[in-house]
């Protein structure tokens, strides 16, 4: 019987998690496995993810791929996989409970540092910026913000006018940016912890009637952000490759179920995407290449 893998992602609105689901499906098809997706209807909702864990436990998958909606609030539910003897594979954002077999992700602090430095160099190392943070409940948000501040320490003439919580969600980011009291359209640049928020900053600025856009960067290299780079509305994005993370985590699960040893951690490199190289990413998620197991494990 083909391995059955339960895949938990945080929401249905962030394109990064759409990419993760695509990655799991592509890998499962190639490896003769099957995946079932468990996604809260309300984005990042703790109670719903706990309910989904209980549903999955009743369906007895062979392995679980898991992205926690909160760093600690779903820990008791995660431990239920251990109690049921179901191996846990973690991707994108680290779990803080459970006997994780393997984590697949990237260095979010380095990613934040690199995309911030790219932005600061573009505005010649001086000016006023706004920061759009993710959700405090996510370690990726905390680490990216730390990377942003590492970069700020290197550029003393960059001043942060405001740092807003966009919760990694497009509607929240737009509202936060629109309601900011001190003329957000007048900053020189906007540093966003993901593309989903960066795109709503663009929408908010359009609604405010901004005559000139600030320089904007994001993270994830989602297709809509690549289109914005192509038209000059965004400067750059960091390719935090959730599709590859999920595909590699799926393969790790299948290999483990087949009796192979797998690394406890697999870290994927991150590349800055801008007007010089965006063409490689200028396609839908399912048309993008995924790195192979041997390419990432042998690095």
For each predicted feature, which ranges?
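Hinge/cleft segment of the Venus flytrap/periplasmic-binding protein
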Residues: 1, 136-139, 151-152, 244-299
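Nucleotide donor/acceptor-binding cores
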Residues: 3-4, 33, 123-129, 214
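Hinge/beta->alpha junction and helix N-cap segments in small-molecule ligand-binding domains
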Residues: 8-22, 37-48, 70, 93, ...
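Short, hydrophobic alpha-helical segments
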Residues: 57, 119-124, 181, 249, ...
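Hydrophobic alpha-helical
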Residues: 57-82, 148, 160-162, 166-228
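Flexible loop/hinge segments that line or gate small-molecule binding clefts
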Residues: 71-110, 118-121, 128, 220-235
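Exported/periplasmic ABC-transporter solute-binding proteins
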Residues: 188-189, 202-243, 247-251, 255-267, ...
């Amino acid at each position: 019987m083909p391995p059955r893998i339960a895949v938990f992602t945080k929401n249905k609105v962030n394109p990064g998690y759409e990419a993760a689901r695509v990655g799991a499906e592509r890998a499962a098809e190639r490896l003769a496995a099957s995946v079932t997706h468990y996604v809260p209807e309300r984005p990042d909702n703790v109670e719903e993810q706990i309910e989904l864990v209980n549903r999955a436990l009743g369906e007895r998958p062979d392995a679980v791929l898991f992205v926690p909606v909160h760093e600690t609030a779903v820990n008791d539910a995660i431990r239920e996989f251990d109690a049921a003897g179901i191996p846990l594979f973690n991707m994108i954002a680290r779990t803080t409970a459970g006997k994780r077999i393997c984590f697949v992700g990237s260095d979010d602090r380095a990613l934040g540092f690199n995309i911030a430095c790219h932005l600061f160099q573009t505005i010649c190392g001086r000016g006023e910026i706004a920061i759009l943070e993710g959700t405090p409940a996510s370690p990726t948000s905390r680490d990216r913000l730390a990377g942003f501040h590492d970069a700020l320490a290197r550029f003393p003439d960059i001043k942060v006018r405001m740092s807003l919580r966009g919760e990694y969600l497009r509607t929240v980011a737009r509202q936060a940016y629109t309601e900011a009291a001190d003329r957000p359209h007048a900053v020189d640049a906007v540093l966003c912890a993901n593309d989903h928020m960066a795109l709503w900053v663009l929408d908010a600025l359009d609604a405010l009637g901004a005559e000139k856009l600030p320089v904007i960067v994001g993270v994830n290299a989602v297709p809509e952000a690549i289109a914005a780079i192509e038209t000059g509305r965004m400067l750059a994005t960091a390719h935090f490759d959730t599709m590859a993370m999920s595909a590699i985590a799926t393969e790790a699960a299948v290999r483990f179920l087949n009796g192979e040893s797998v690394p406890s951690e697999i870290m994927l490199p991150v590349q800055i995407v801008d007007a010089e190289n965006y063409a490689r990413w200028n396609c839908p998620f399912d048309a993008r290449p995924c790195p192979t197991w041997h390419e990432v494990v042998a690095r």
